[in-house]
């Protein structure tokens, strides 16, 4: 039997999603340990998209296979009670055997939030980035539109990125402000390592007036990571979750 889970987590205390076997706790290892305890047998999960250390997940989707019979609600609640307080299973549904959390997804969504004021955050320091320079979100939004479409995003990929190529389709990019908080929301078919944080780091330079709006288009065309902006800090980034065709019968928040 194959199940899909929707998982929410605060990434502050983890070295990332992936279980690499050493170097500190991972979200994946914590989830697999809890699931295995419920099943009373070892279980492994496959996720829709891996996140880095300090990055959060609002509705990460995973799947796992098991012969153990449990009600979906028992998987959800039983697993959550065995997890650290920074991880929760939001839902569990049985899925077809050919459903794949990663390969069945048609899009992925991220949100980056930063506090734009002179003084650093105290209360929300684990879920907000911070920029003391005054930023113009309208300039950031205008600049970001140059990235929409299928492009080579080499200028915004990490040097550690292991993807075979840098072509990705960015479907939308919206920059907005609510009071002192600027939000960058993106959706694409897939993302390169550090791609969202590198885009945000470059957009900040446009918003501060250090670079013109046209600079983002020039970066994209130049494909040179060394001349783009710095990588934005991880704590402002949330993986909102993937999106799937409706034939998989998943909850509405992850369905196209």
From Swiss-Prot:
Q: What keywords tag this UniProt record? A: Isomerase, tRNA processing
| Cited CDD domains | PseudoU_synth_EcTruA
Q: What class of enzyme is it?
A: isomerase
- Which residue spans adopt a coiled-coil conformation according to this UniProt entry? none
Binding annotation for substrate = 110
Q: Which GO MF terms does the UniProt record name?
A: RNA binding; tRNA pseudouridine(38-40) synthase activity
Substrates-to-products reaction catalysed: uridine(38/39/40) in tRNA = pseudouridine(38/39/40) in tRNA
Query: Is the Iron keyword given for this protein?
Result: no
User: What biological-process GO terms show up in the record?
Assistant: tRNA pseudouridine synthesis
Pfam families linked: PseudoU_synth_1
By its UniProt entry, which InterPro entries does this protein fall under?
PsdUridine_synth_cat_dom_sf, PsdUridine_synth_TruA, PsdUridine_synth_TruA_a/b_dom, PsdUridine_synth_TruA_C, TruA/RsuA/RluB/E/F_N
Q: Which residues form the active site?
A: 52
Task: State its Enzyme Commission number(s).
Answer: 5.4.99.12
Summarizing the function annotation, the protein's role is:
Formation of pseudouridine at positions 38, 39 and 40 in the anticodon stem and loop of transfer RNAs.
HAMAP family documented for this protein: TruA (MF_00171)
Q: What family is it from?
A: Belongs to the tRNA pseudouridine synthase TruA family.
The record describes its quaternary structure and partners as: Homodimer.
The name under which this protein is listed is tRNA pseudouridine synthase A
| Native source organism of the sequence | Stenotrophomonas maltophilia (strain K279a)
């Amino acid at each position: 039997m194959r199940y899909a889970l929707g998982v929410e987590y605060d990434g502050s205390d983890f070295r990332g999603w992936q279980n690499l076997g050493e170097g500190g706790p991972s979200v994946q290892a914590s989830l697999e340990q809890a699931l295995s305890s419920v099943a009373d047998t070892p279980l492994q999960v496959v996720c829709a998209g891996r996140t880095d250390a300090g990055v959060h997940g609002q509705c990460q989707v995973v799947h796992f296979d098991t012969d153990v019979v449990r009600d979906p609600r028992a998987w959800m609640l039983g697993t959550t009670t065995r997890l650290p307080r920074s991880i929760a299973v939001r839902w569990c549904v049985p899925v077809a055997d050919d459903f794949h959390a990663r390969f069945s997804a048609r899009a992925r969504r991220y949100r980056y939030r930063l506090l734009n004021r002179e003084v650093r955050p105290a209360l929300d320091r684990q879920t907000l980035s911070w920029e003391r320079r005054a930023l113009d979100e309208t300039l950031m939004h205008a600049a970001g539109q140059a990235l929409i479409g299928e492009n080579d995003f080499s200028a915004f990929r990490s040097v550690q990125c292991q993807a075979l190529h840098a072509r990705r389709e960015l479907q939308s990019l919206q920059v907005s402000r609510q009071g002192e908080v600027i939000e960058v929301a993106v959706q694409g078919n897939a993302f390169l390592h550090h791609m969202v944080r590198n885009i945000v780091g470059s957009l900040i330079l446009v918003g501060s007036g250090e670079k013109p709006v046209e600079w983002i288009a020039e970066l994209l065309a130049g494909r040179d990571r060394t001349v783009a902006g710095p990588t934005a800090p991880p704590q402002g980034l949330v993986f909102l979750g993937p999106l799937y065709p409706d034939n998989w019968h998943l909850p509405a928040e992850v369905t196209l």
